[in-house]
Amino acid sequence: MFVPDPLRAAVSDEAWLAAMLDAERALAEVTGDEEAAAACHPELYDVERLCEEGRADANPVVPLARALRERAPGAHRGATSQDILDTAAMLVARNARELVLAELDGAAAAAASLAEQHRSTPMAARTLLQQAAPTTFGLKAAGWLVGLVDARRRLAGARLPAQLGGPVGTMDPELTSRFAAALGLEEPVVPWHVHRGPVAELGAALDAAAAACAKVGLDVVLLAQTEVGEVSEAESGGSSSMPHKRNPAAAVLARACARIVHANAGLLTAGDYEHERAAGAWQAEWPALSAALAFAGGAAAAARRSLEGLEVHADRMQANIAVEALPGEGAATAEALVDRALAHYREST
């Protein structure tokens, strides 16, 4: 209900297994172990069994490495479990991020269309939930647009480095360089086993993206209230007990997904890990990262649906304005700000 199917698949246990095996294959290739590389096919392994066996070690790479060595004794040579899991996390994030970015692009395009279409549509601005002074709906949509564009840019720029430090971070950096290149990931300056900047950066970027979507959702929910009635979603949700209701369901989902991202972002941005390997904090990242990626995409997809089908009731906006009509100077300023937002959007596409 919350997350689009492609995103669910992108962060599934099967996706993590495939990513771990991609990391193992790249390690085998850069060390010249063809037998180990040939053993790195997901269909050869039972993901449910690996998850179950991984509980005993608090780590799914331990049983995976054991299974790999049954087929190729040289597999996993020189690496530690965290090398494989951190690299897999970056691969999972890379694939899922593309899906999140696509949904953000769709939401931004819809916001841009609304901003342009309603550049001069007057409405009441509200501060502390009270009417303040007139503005335009185009400017409100322009604010959504800039928030989405800037969040998208931040997420797209988040670093995704490979990890190959060996048991205590002393692996040959030349090998790490070739390993990263084989996977198309960034080469780290030093191993980041307990220096979690990349994970924190990704978590913060996903959180910001979710917040931009939640802002859209909250504004739509408030504007769609019966007593306000200034917008409505084309595909409104219903009620099990009150058939007359038209609930802004997509906006509600955008807010719900964003809250789940916020809850998981704290686990990704904590950062205070002990010595050369964290006991518990690192392990907590895995489900938190999957959830943050999935629900950030869910928030963006819901915001996109809400905006693409948003019905704007300009007559109700005009009727709700409790003060004199927007003076010419104010209208011109609002329109100019809309144009600035649209230019910012076009520069980003």
Residue ranges and their predicted role:
Residues 34-40, 106-107, 223-227, 236, ...:
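Short alpha-helical "patches" and their helix-cap loops
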Residues 84, 260, 321-323:
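Weak global preference for isoleucine
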Residues 89-102, 109, 116, 123, ...:
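Charged, flexible cofactor/metal-binding loops and thiol motifs
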Residues 305-327:
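Generic long, charged, amphipathic alpha-helical segments
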